[in-house]
């Protein structure tokens, strides 16, 4: 299992350039499969999830040229070669499920996707995806092996209301609807900035898509697609991650390309606990300004709320903030398990199955530990940790950097490769001492 040794008592200083958004890039690659036209994507992050998606597209028939130095991908899929996704792709992440929507136009007699993998943060049901596709006219068969979708008579526009504004379901239904006949209206849709980026991409390809402020997306199906050149938005999760690392280490980092308009809920909560930042034309500078004050309720939500991927690194900040703070995770029912690692380091965290908030969430009646109370500030001690998922991984690295002496062993670091371009190199250039397993003996 890949691992690193992270030394504590580290103050991070310098600048870092945020990469293109993981959650936009992978979906845009899938969207390129909608037609046989050429697509050029710029600002492409060199991360494992993108590499896996590129490999998946190639297996399906795409011709891909990736200039990693220039961060540019050119992709062209003259025809779809496979109707069944190889199982090795579904065990890594959840991207393959979007092929049900994206490929039904080109593979009307069926596309099969095996049971999915991804982060261990809860089941993340596909019910919203599948029911929405059925309303568009798709025939769905579910087995122990996976999901089979077909539309031998083609897809037809429909009115769809999602029970919950699921990001994945919204993306899947957009991809299916652009190839359907007539008009589709998706109500209670997710409108994260990555989804808006997908919509902009599809508009460039000739699609007629509009959105409004009440979470409604209107799509007119089209059979003619244009070639597209598109620059991917910066990754708001990576930007916030390095911002939190700056504050918790009592340092100062300028995060180049960070867009404050994509991060307003995060910046608001960061300011409320005393974290410092200043917005510039080409990025955001984050810095330690004064002792952090807790006593906040951190409640995750869909856009325009505080997104769930910011929650785990923010817990490290709360462990160093004076007072009692509450986390209420409303997006994924099993995303607080990583707190065991912080407790092992000395943090005071208590898990609860109840909704510790003025409002109840969809997990209020289940037996899910989705709320937590964190007391701070608490000195953290170096220890051995195993990363359970991508964002928890960055939280563990942040925590290890501020331990009082010693060094922490952190294993399963390939999780970080999924979502952070050159994360180790960036941290080292900011002053961190991060050693791979094969070089540790030099420093022991």
UniProtKB/Swiss-Prot annotation:
UDP-N-acetyl-alpha-D-glucosamine binds at residues 94, 309, 331. Keywords: Cell cycle, Cell division, Cell shape, Cell wall biogenesis/degradation, Cytoplasm, Peptidoglycan synthesis, Transferase. One of its GO terms (biological process) is cell division. Its EC number is 2.5.1.7. GO terms for cellular component: cytoplasm. Pathway: Cell wall biogenesis; peptidoglycan biosynthesis. Phosphoenolpyruvate binds at residues 22-23. The keyword Cell wall biogenesis/degradation applies. Its main location: cytoplasm. It is found in: Cytoplasm. The keyword Transmembrane does not apply. It holds the Pfam family EPSP_synthase. CDD domains: UdpNAET. It comes from the Bacteria. It catalyses: phosphoenolpyruvate + UDP-N-acetyl-alpha-D-glucosamine = UDP-N-acetyl-3-O-(1-carboxyvinyl)-alpha-D-glucosamine + phosphate. It is an enzyme of class 2 (transferase). GO terms for molecular function: UDP-N-acetylglucosamine 1-carboxyvinyltransferase activity. The active site is at 119 (proton donor). Belongs to the EPSP synthase family. MurA subfamily. NCBIfam families: murA, PRK09369.1. Cell wall formation. Adds enolpyruvyl to UDP-N-acetylglucosamine. This is UDP-N-acetylglucosamine 1-carboxyvinyltransferase. It comes from Chlamydia trachomatis serovar A (strain ATCC VR-571B / DSM 19440 / HAR-13).
């Amino acid at each position: 299992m890949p691992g690193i040794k992270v030394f504590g008592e580290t103050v991070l200083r310098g600048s870092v350039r945020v990469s293109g958004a993981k959650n936009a890039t992978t979906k845009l690659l899938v969207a390129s499969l909608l037609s046989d036209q050429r697509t050029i994507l710029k600002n492409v992050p060199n991360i494992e999830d993108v590499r896996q998606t590129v490999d998946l597209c190639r297996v399906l028939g795409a011709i891909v040229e990736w200039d990693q130095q220039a961060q540019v991908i050119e992709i062209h899929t003259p025809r779809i070669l496979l109707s069944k996704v190889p199982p090795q792709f579904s065990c890594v992440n959840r991207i393959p499920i979007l092929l049900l929507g994206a490929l039904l136009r080109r593979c009307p007699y069926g596309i099969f996707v095996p049971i999915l993998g991804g982060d261990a943060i809860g089941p993340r049901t596909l019910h919203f995806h599948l029911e929405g596709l059925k309303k568009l006219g798709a025939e769905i068969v579910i087995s122990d092996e996976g999901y089979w979708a077909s539309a031998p008579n083609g897809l037809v526009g429909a009115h769809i209301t999602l029970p919950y504004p699921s990001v994945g379901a919204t993306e899947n239904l957009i991809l299916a609807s652009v190839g359907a006949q007539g008009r589709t209206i998706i109500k209670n849709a997710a409108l994260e900035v990555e989804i808006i980026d997908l919509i902009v991409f599809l508009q460039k390809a000739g699609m007629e898509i509009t959105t409004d402020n009440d979470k409604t997306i209107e799509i007119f199906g089209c059979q003619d697609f244009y070639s597209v050149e598109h620059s991917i938005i910066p990754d708001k999760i990576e930007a916030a991650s390095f911002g939190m690392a700056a504050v918790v280490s009592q340092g100062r980092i300028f995060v180049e390309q960070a867009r404050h308009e994509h991060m307003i809920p995060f910046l608001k909560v960061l300011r409320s606990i005393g974290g410092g930042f200043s917005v510039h034309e080409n990025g955001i500078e984050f810095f330690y300004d004064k002792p952090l004050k807790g006593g906040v309720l951190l409640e995750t939500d869909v856009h325009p709320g505080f997104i769930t991927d910011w929650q785990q690194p923010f817990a490290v900040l709360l462990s160093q903030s004076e007072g009692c703070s509450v986390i209420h995770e409303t997006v994924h029912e099993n995303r607080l398990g990583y707190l065991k690692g912080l407790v092992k380091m000395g943090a005071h965290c208590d898990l609860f199955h109840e909704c510790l908030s003025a409002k109840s969430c969809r997990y209020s009646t289940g037996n899910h530990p989705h709320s937590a109370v964190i007391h701070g500030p608490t000195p953290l001690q170096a220890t051995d940790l195993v990363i359970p998922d991508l964002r928890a991984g960055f939280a563990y690295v942040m925590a290890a950097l501020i331990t009082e002496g010693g060094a922490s062993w952190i294993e399963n670091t390939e999780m970080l490769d999924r979502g952070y371009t050159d994360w180790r190199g960036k941290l080292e250039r900011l002053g961190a001492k991060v050693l791979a397993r094969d070089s540790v003996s030099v420093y022991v």
